[in-house]
Amino acid sequence: MTTSNRRYHITTFGCQMNKADSERMAGILEDMGFKFSEDPNNADLILYNTCTIRDNAEQKVYSYLGRQAKRKHEQPDLTLVVAGCVAQQEGEALLRRVPELDLVMGPQHANRLKDLLESVFAGNQVVATEAVHIMEDITQARRDSTVTAWVNVIYGCNERCTYCVVPNVRGVEQSRTPAAVRAEMEELGRQGYKEITLLGQNIDAYGRDLPGATPEGRHLHTFTDLLYYVHDVPGVERIRFATSHPRYFTERLIKACAELPKVCEHFHIPFQSGDNQLLKAMARGYTQEKYRRIIDTIRRYMPDASISADAIVGFPGETEEQFENTLKLVDDIGFDQLNTAAYSPRPGTPAALWENQLSEEVKSDRLQRLNHLVNVKAAERSQRYMGRIEEVLVEEQNPKDQTQVMGRTGGNRLTFFKGDIHELKGQLVMVKINEVRAFSLTGEPIEMRQALPI
């Protein structure tokens, strides 16, 4: 089947890993001759890259699918693809539920999209969910931004948190080689990208599956070593990373972040609960005391560092006292941002089978109370920016005010100021902050710093 005049549309649900996968799959489709369509109803191939972390995200996928499945009866040459974690979890059951589907593919198969589609175009209905070694992707991704980019450094997760479906759907940990990561970053630097976020479901596990050991007995390749190896890539001005696991977060990594000028002083370290009994039930492998020590160590080396995290309320058996321990941790630490969620039972996880599930009313009440505290603490944290001069990397026009541009500080605070996006996009601008809100800032531009060649 010729693809030169065909159009594609990708809808992405879920995490940054999914967004990075979608960019790679878009690059493969364009390499095959497909053109991007903003409107899914004008596309000849529709791909849903799905998330199964929470039930509402999964149900949204089925809602979208239902509309396009009806359309396929009127347009038989429409190609329907479900990728990502729902595809991995459901496999052939998806075909029984939505027989109009052409391709069901798990996240490990993202780089194999061309081969899988060629089988579809040969007349086959394809399910690709078997465990595979992830191939290096030589196709240039179609990036959603021209300023910032994601680079995967490790796929999969070997943890077995009792609430989490990720290891079931993303497979075991597979680290890319340091050379492969640096090569991709160097290409992005040549293309003009200024900020790169290194991605992993559990990024601190990087290198555990790679061969070799140091004379001291540690793994030859660790995430800390990777940061030292890639921090001087020409053209790249900022490096971020996510997501960290408290169980493996080391002082050596913190020291590296403090020493390396391109690494942003922003850490995303989920704690999930502030209660030790619940952390044990979740199989997280640390205590709230250890988590507090990590944050204390970060702030000892980098007093102004921004801290963000994830938290779950309403985990099976959570008592009011245990929930209040979470509130106390949030109140004591003062996060710059906290992603919160009510516990959602996921198929194939131990916690989903436990009998001590909480009511939706209790979960909703606790989520509301936690979110209120999060907003209060974030507003308090924002006060430190008032009157300061912050370096902002300009990314886009403010969609709500065409006279303003927007970007992020090194600490990941969204910042708005007057300016022309055509002049400033991709530039580092010194901005004096004159207005602060819980999760964003506004200021006046002071000067622009051109990115210096190395």
Curated annotation (Swiss-Prot):
Residues annotated for [4Fe-4S] cluster 2 binding in this entry: C157, C161, C164
Catalysed reactions listed for this entry: N(6)-dimethylallyladenosine(37) in tRNA + (sulfur carrier)-SH + AH2 + 2 S-adenosyl-L-methionine = 2-methylsulfanyl-N(6)-dimethylallyladenosine(37) in tRNA + (sulfur carrier)-H + 5'-deoxyadenosine + L-methionine + A + S-adenosyl-L-homocysteine + 2 H(+)
Pull one GO CC term from this UniProt entry.
Answer: cytoplasm
Identify the InterPro entries for this entry.
Answer: Elp3/MiaA/NifB-like_rSAM (IPR006638), Methylthiotransferase (IPR005839), Methylthiotransferase_CS (IPR020612), Methylthiotransferase_N (IPR013848), Methylthiotransferase_N_sf (IPR038135), MiaB_methiolase (IPR006463), rSAM (IPR007197), rSAM_horseshoe (IPR023404)
Q: Where in the cell is it found?
A: Cytoplasm
Q: Which residue intervals define the domain TRAM in the entry?
A: 383-447
- S-S bridge residues: none
* Keywords carried by this UniProt record: 4Fe-4S, Cytoplasm, Iron, Iron-sulfur, Metal-binding, S-adenosyl-L-methionine, Transferase, tRNA processing
Top-level enzyme category: transferase
- Keyword Lipid biosynthesis assigned: no
Cofactor(s) of this protein: [4Fe-4S] cluster
Cofactor comment text? Binds 2 [4Fe-4S] clusters. One cluster is coordinated with 3 cysteines and an exchangeable S-adenosyl-L-methionine.
Family statement: Belongs to the methylthiotransferase family. MiaB subfamily.
Question: What is its biological role?
Answer: Catalyzes the methylthiolation of N6-(dimethylallyl)adenosine (i(6)A), leading to the formation of 2-methylthio-N6-(dimethylallyl)adenosine (ms(2)i(6)A) at position 37 in tRNAs that read codons beginning with uridine.
Please identify the protein, giving its name as recorded: tRNA-2-methylthio-N(6)-dimethylallyladenosine synthase
What is the native source organism of this protein?
A: Nostoc sp. (strain PCC 7120 / SAG 25.82 / UTEX 2576)
**Which gene is the coding source of this polypeptide chain?**
miaB
